[in-house]
């Protein structure tokens, strides 16, 4: 399945949760989900009872759409998490959090992961002093992630930094906002990552 490129607010209403896909509207409390917290369509307000498989599938979709990954990428990450020692679900979330586009978003250089992905692919981001244009690039603890010199006055990046200053920055990155760089200090603990996803259902789905 390819990466979702359709109307993001309709997707959030269908899944019933905010996926942080609309930055400024979400921060301003103007998202479609807040105004109409039910699925789109004629019968949207009457949510059908969901099966166990449907629940497992929904949790996978929420994670995929939130982090902006394809089915192939997601399955590959799950397989890697399953091979490692530890809690597979927590390790999956950790691997998703290490994606470069997500780290750019977490550092506050973009209001959404979608915009962060664009910044990466268009060459606006450096990792340890080198330009990296692959959104799925894995950022290792201790890495320096910065906005390229030519892009530091980009109005969208400046606006994003101003907006995310209202919401704060996660504990596993240190950011110098004025200089527009940050350090990915460590991998987060699962309980630190606040996302509306119950990854145990994803583990159940892929374990069948």
From Swiss-Prot:
Domain S4 RNA-binding as annotated: residue spans: 98-161
Entry protein name: Small ribosomal subunit protein uS4
SMART domains registered for this protein in UniProt: Ribosomal_S4, S4
Function: One of the primary rRNA binding proteins, it binds directly to 16S rRNA where it nucleates assembly of the body of the 30S subunit. With S5 and S12 plays an important role in translational accuracy.
Keywords attached to this entry: Ribonucleoprotein, Ribosomal protein, RNA-binding, rRNA-binding
Assembly and oligomerization: Part of the 30S ribosomal subunit. Contacts protein S5. The interaction surface between S4 and S5 is involved in control of translational fidelity.
Pfam family, one: Ribosomal_S4
Gene Ontology MF terms: rRNA binding; structural constituent of ribosome
PANTHER family xref list: 30S 40S RIBOSOMAL PROTEIN, SMALL RIBOSOMAL SUBUNIT PROTEIN US4M
Family, per entry: Belongs to the universal ribosomal protein uS4 family.
Recorded superkingdom: Bacteria
Record GO biological process: ribosomal small subunit biogenesis; translation
GO CC terms, sorted: small ribosomal subunit
PROSITE patterns referenced in this protein's UniProt entry, alphabetically: RIBOSOMAL_S4, S4
CDD domains: S4
Source organism per UniProt: Campylobacter concisus (strain 13826)
């Amino acid at each position: 399945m390819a990466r979702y490129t359709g109307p993001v607010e309709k997707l959030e209403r269908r899944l019933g949760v905010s996926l942080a896909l609309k930055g400024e509207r979400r921060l301003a409390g103007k998202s479609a989900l807040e105004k109409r917290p039910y699925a789109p369509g004629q019968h949207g307000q009457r949510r059908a009872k969901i099966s166990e498989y449907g629940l497992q599938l929904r949790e996978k979709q929420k994670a995929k759409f939130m982090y902006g990954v394809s089915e192939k990428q997601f399955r590959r990450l799950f397989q890697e998490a399953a091979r490692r020692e530890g809690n597979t679900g927590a390790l999956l979330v950790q691997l998703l959090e290490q994606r470069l586009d997500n780290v750019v978003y977490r550092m506050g250089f973009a209001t959404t992961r979608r915009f962060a992905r664009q910044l990466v692919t268009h060459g606006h981001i450096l990792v340890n002093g080198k330009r990296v244009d692959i959104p799925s690039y894995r950022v290792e603890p201790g890495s320096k992630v910065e906005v390229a010199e030519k892009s530091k006055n980009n109005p969208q990046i400046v606006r994003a930094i101003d907006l995310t200053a209202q919401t704060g920055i996660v504990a596993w990155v240190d950011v110098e906002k004025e200089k527009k760089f940050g350090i990915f200090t460590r991998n987060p603990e699962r309980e630190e990552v606040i996302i509306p996803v119950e990854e145990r259902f994803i583990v159940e789905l892929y374990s069948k």
